[in-house]
Amino acid sequence: MFVGFLLMTLAASSIFAATAAEPRARDLGVPFEGSPGTLNAITDVAGVSVGQVTLVEDLADGNKVRTGVTAILPRGRGSFDTPVFGGWFALNGNGEMTGTAWLEESGQLEGPVMLTNTHSVGVVRDAVIAERVRAGGADASGYWWSLPVVAETWDGHLNDINGFHVKPEHAAQALSDAKDGPVAEGNVGGGTGMVCHEFKCGIGTASRRVAAEGQGYTVGALVQANYGVRDTLRIAGVPVGQHLREDRVYTDLALAVAGEQPGGDTGSIIVVIATDAPLLPHQLKRLAKRAGMGLARMGSYAGNGSGDIFIAFSTANAAAAAGAAVNQAQFVGNDHLDTLFEATVQATEEAIVNAMVAARDMRGEDGHYAKALPHAELVKLLKRYGRYERSR
């Protein structure tokens, strides 16, 4: 059992938090391919739960806290007890996802996937181990060990990232609060201070229902989006970034120093893919790779300064991953993976747009400001390009 903590630093956490009840991309008429699950969220994959802690505070010393933690538990409360098969892929490795050496070697994800800011990876990693020890997961012999998976993106434009405001109790609370059902998006959890294509962004999620080998399966995606420049942004094929040119965070010509052009894509994105389709670790690595195509649809080119790192896991084959001496696992044949690949691309793309739509304007550290994607202007562009689809 996870131990909850009283979070004294969450006094203003509701100011910028977008809730799952607010409009999503489809509500604005953005057309997407594929059939979503009931919630159109990663939690459509049975057993997956998500917990988030959002930290927003204006400190007395003038610094601004705009950060948090997101926890994805593949098997809910049983995630520490029963691993899942998993695989990962770095499209561009200017970032961090701990625990991937053992994930690559073993093919198993043991415990949750945690998302936070770049300079809080260590404290979150340690907190996950501490929670497992506290829950009785440690071997009494003293030889038990854990290599948690913690991934990051940089929120230092809006957040006092060097103030180290994420504490162990925040990671513990994200784990304790994890639940199924709708997932809050936008300025929440690890995505609180993130910026995407120079619009305010954060956490987003989506899902797809597909058939493979005559069976129905679900693929879900959750993103912590913090990548991209405005010029390349495309939504449903519409060159949105070429039209909405105001309030750019990084590439406005007014930001140029000594006549030099402002910087390019220096952000990052973490994509978490979940499925109930029975897949082996090497197949899940193939699935993770397809997340990059969802980014490409959005206009990402995976710039040198961007950490684009993806992880995929399957909740199937629980018995095979339980640690017996000899195990049997089912898996979808390689010739039948295409629908799952396509679903991954579609869900990743929609999750990113959902993150942008849910986010709200935010002012943060040093007065820095990130404007959210303007809904009305997006709808106008969709109609102009014949891509508007009335929500049902």
PLM region spans:
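Alpha/propeptide regions of enzymes that mature by internal proteolysis
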Residues: A18-R392
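Bacterial N-terminal signal peptides
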Residues: V3-S14
